[in-house]
């Protein structure tokens, strides 16, 4: 059963200059949109009203959202529609692979809505998408951004990890104190355990997680989330500014200045993340392809450093 969406009716605040982006336009943008329509694919870029859609789609980058466009939950920060989803589309995995091939993607990000109505939470569809991508465009690296799978997490994670995506992303979204109002359908430590389990099952898979700031969190709370992530051996941290999608969603508590993001990034790097992306416009899949290359290079550099240290 869906949780009720907190009704705030808070008017959207005027964004500072560092948040503003150009309106999407251009032939490449139009071509990407047309391709997604033709293959009957949803994208989180559109459904979540991502501010970077113009830049990404112009570069023919898109984050595909599988399992439909309707979520069984109603988080206070998310613009994806809530309700009873349609049945799973058996053709969707191949359509995702066809889109990746047609766009010539070197790296693809695949996410989904929450599907609490399904016995496996949608895990089998993630596996089928990964398998279709490996068959159709084997050189494309695969990043998945999954939900928490609620009470089905153990079986779901084992199934997906066995399919061997290159990056497993699951966002913590915010600090634990704000979960009851911002992410009421989820549990902070369950999400943390999910990522810890991925790394335990297959240490070669990169793990990634992100949080939003500007929801009323304290800096020390953000630092604690970083520590929790490192305890779970998460490789890559993303941080971005929360933006209120509609007046019905949670209000922006504050617009975090770029210098504060720089400070957060420096602290995160000192805590041992392989890679950190922290800017007002950072989103989970923003520059994901370039970041995957950096992530791989950072791991190789770390392994080389360890190999160079003589055994005690």
Swiss-Prot record:
PROSITE patterns noted in UniProt: RADICAL_SAM
Domain Radical SAM core intervals: 57-274
Main subcellular location of this protein, as a coarse class: cytoplasm
Protein location: Cytoplasm
Disulphide bridges, residue numbers: none
GO CC field: cytoplasm
EC number: 2.8.1.8
Signal peptide (residue range): none
Pathway: Protein modification; protein lipoylation via endogenous pathway; protein N(6)-(lipoyl)lysine from octanoyl-[acyl-carrier-protein]: step 2/2
Pfam families: LIAS_N, Radical_SAM
Cofactors named for this entry: [4Fe-4S] cluster
CC cofactor note: Binds 2 [4Fe-4S] clusters per subunit. One cluster is coordinated with 3 cysteines and an exchangeable S-adenosyl-L-methionine.
Similarity-based family: Belongs to the radical SAM superfamily. Lipoyl synthase family.
Protein name: Lipoyl synthase
Name of the coding gene: lipA
């Amino acid at each position: 059963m869906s949780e009720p969406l907190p009704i705030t009716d808070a008017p959207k605040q005027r964004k500072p200059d560092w948040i503003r982006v150009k309106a999407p336009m251009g032939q490449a943008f139009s071509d990407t949109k047309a391709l997604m329509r033709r293959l009957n694919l949803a994208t989180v870029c559109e459904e979540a009203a991502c501010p970077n859609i113009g830049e990404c789609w112009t570069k023919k980058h898109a984050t595909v959202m599988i399992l439909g466009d309707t979520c069984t939950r109603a988080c206070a920060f998310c613009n994806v529609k809530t309700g009873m989803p349609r049945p799973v589309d058996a053709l969707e995995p191949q359509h995702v692979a066809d889109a990746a091939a047609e766009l010539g993607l070197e790296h693809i990000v695949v996410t989904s809505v929450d599907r609490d109505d399904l016995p496996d939470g949608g895990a089998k569809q993630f596996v089928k998408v990964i398998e279709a991508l490996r068959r159709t465009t084997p050189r494309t690296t695969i990043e998945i951004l999954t939900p928490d799978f609620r009470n089905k997490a153990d079986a779901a994670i084992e199934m997906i990890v066995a399919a061997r995506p290159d990056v497993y992303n699951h966002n913590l979204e915010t600090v634990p104190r704000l979960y009851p109002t911002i992410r009421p359908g989820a549990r902070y430590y369950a999400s943390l355990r999910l990522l810890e389990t991925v790394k335990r099952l297959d240490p070669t898979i990169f793990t990634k997680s992100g949080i939003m700031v500007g929801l009323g969190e304290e800096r020390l709370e953000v630092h604690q989330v970083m520590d929790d992530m490192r305890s779970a051996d998460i490789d890559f941290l993303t941080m971005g500014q929360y933006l209120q999608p509609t007046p019905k969603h949670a209000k922006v508590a504050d617009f975090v200045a770029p210098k504060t993001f720089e400070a957060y990034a420096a602290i995160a790097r000192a805590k041992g993340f392989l890679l950190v992306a922290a800017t007002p416009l950072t989103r989970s899949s923003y520059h994901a392809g370039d970041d995957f290359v950096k992530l791989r290079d950072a791991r190789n550099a770390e392994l080389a450093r360890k190999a160079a240290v003589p055994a005690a």
